[in-house]
Amino acid sequence: VFAYRERMITRCHIKGDAPSVAVYSDCERYRYLLTREWAPAQGRALFIMLNPSTATEVQNDPTVERCERRARALGFGGFRVCNIFAYRATDPRVMRAAADPVGPDNDGAIMDSVPWADRVICAWGTHGAHLDRGARVAAMLRATGVDLFHLGLSKAGHPKHPLYIGYAVQPVAWV
């Protein structure tokens, strides 16, 4: 387990049938993890996306709602969201303008989440080109030997963001 550099705030809530946990930096500018589990024995999906928006342990934003519905449709009993940038912003331009959009403990949070998951779905979209972060995270993940999946690739080869991808699209191995 990674030794985090900052103090973390962990908040829990029961959202419907799913205990929910969110981990934030002590300043709350960063959200490192968001986890919902309703039947962990059924397996867990890890979505690695761009950056956190407004979702909390209590409420989904549109993207996290899509991830939850997709995880349920795929037969998983839980999911977690990590992001290649942990800075909380609704607009990628605001995230890109932040002094440290990655967050001091983000790599540790991502790497701690990989063994937690039964399937890792990369989905950060074309904004992953910022600071070459998408490629760096992909290399970090590939070094673990875990199989990576995506929901489609952009023309530039970035794993597509899930917000506008239909539920009929199945995760595909990212080789």
Stretches found by the model and what they are:
Residues 95-175:
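Glycine/proline-rich loop-helix segments at beta-alpha junctions forming the active-site rim
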Residues 52-54, 86, 127-128:
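Short, glycine/serine-rich, charged loops/turns that create anion-binding
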Residues 2-61:
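Active-site and ligand/interface coordination hotspots across diverse enzymes
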Residues 64-72:
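Short catalytic helix/loop segments, enriched in acidic residues and glycine
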Residues 77-93:
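Short connector loops at secondary-structure junctions
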Residues 30, 63-64, 106-107:
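Amphipathic coiled-coil/heptad-repeat helices and related helical stalk/stem segments
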Residues 59-63, 132-134:
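Residues at alpha-helix caps and immediate loop-helix transition turns in enzyme cores, especially N-
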